[in-house]
């Protein structure tokens, strides 16, 4: 009887561990229309809106199994809504994070994220000048699992077009490890969004600090 009890206890413990692991599987957030996010730029004439939602605090970042902040990355949930009657092309889209001190950062490719996670000292932003006095980083052990690689791949913003009356979304990752407060005074510039005839829309500029403010309550 005691043996059976011990077996049941162990089985329950194992089941609990499995359940916890399963619960940690990444699920990409369901995107809302871009203009509903605090940090967005809405081109009403062109009927296209783009939003940027930084996952820069522990509560939001807990959807990931990877601690991106610990490795110097800023995940931004990027949302494009096309309310027009024609598709738009984003195959040549360029996204740039511009900080308060005019530092410019472009999204990091998955393979560069893998390299940083495997080797925390790796430089994934060779084109960006470091700060005169780098912010000391916590020593991080380099390792990456297949699950983490799959999570990074599946979370990426990968759309090449946005069909009429639809929204596309996904994460862009920026290497901001040397910046203490990357959101303060920063904005995201977006170019290379084209209409169905190939003409480029006016560039989008999104003030990231607005993401720190809750949306106003309806009257």
List where the protein language model places each region.
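Hydrophobic transmembrane signal anchors and adjacent membrane-proximal interface regions, especially
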Residues: 7-8, 37
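Conserved functional micro-motifs across diverse proteins
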Residues: 21-219
């Amino acid at each position: 009887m005691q043996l059976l009890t011990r077996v049941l206890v162990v089985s329950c413990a194992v089941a609990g561990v499995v359940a916890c692991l399963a619960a940690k599987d990444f699920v990409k957030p369901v995107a809302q229309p871009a203009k509903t996010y605090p940090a967005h730029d809405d081109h009403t004439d062109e009927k296209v809106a783009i939003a940027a939602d930084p996952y820069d605090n522990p509560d939001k970042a807990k959807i990931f199994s990877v601690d991106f902040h610990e490795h110097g990355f800023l995940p931004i949930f990027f949302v494009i809504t096309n309310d027009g009657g024609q598709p738009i092309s984003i195959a040549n889209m360029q996204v740039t994070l511009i900080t308060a001190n005019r530092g410019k950062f472009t999204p990091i490719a998955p393979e560069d994220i893998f390299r940083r996670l495997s080797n925390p000292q790796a430089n994934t932003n060779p084109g960006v000048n470091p700060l005169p006095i780098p912010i000391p980083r916590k020593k991080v052990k380099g390792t990456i699992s297949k699950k983490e690689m799959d999570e990074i791949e599946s979370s990426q913003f990968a759309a090449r077009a946005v069909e009429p009356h639809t929204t596309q979304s996904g994460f862009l990752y920026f290497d901001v490890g040397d910046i203490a407060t990357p959101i303060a005074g920063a904005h995201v510039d977006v170019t290379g969004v084209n209409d169905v005839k190939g003409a480029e829309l006016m560039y989008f500029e999104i003030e990231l600090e607005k993401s720190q403010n809750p949306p106003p309550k309806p009257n």
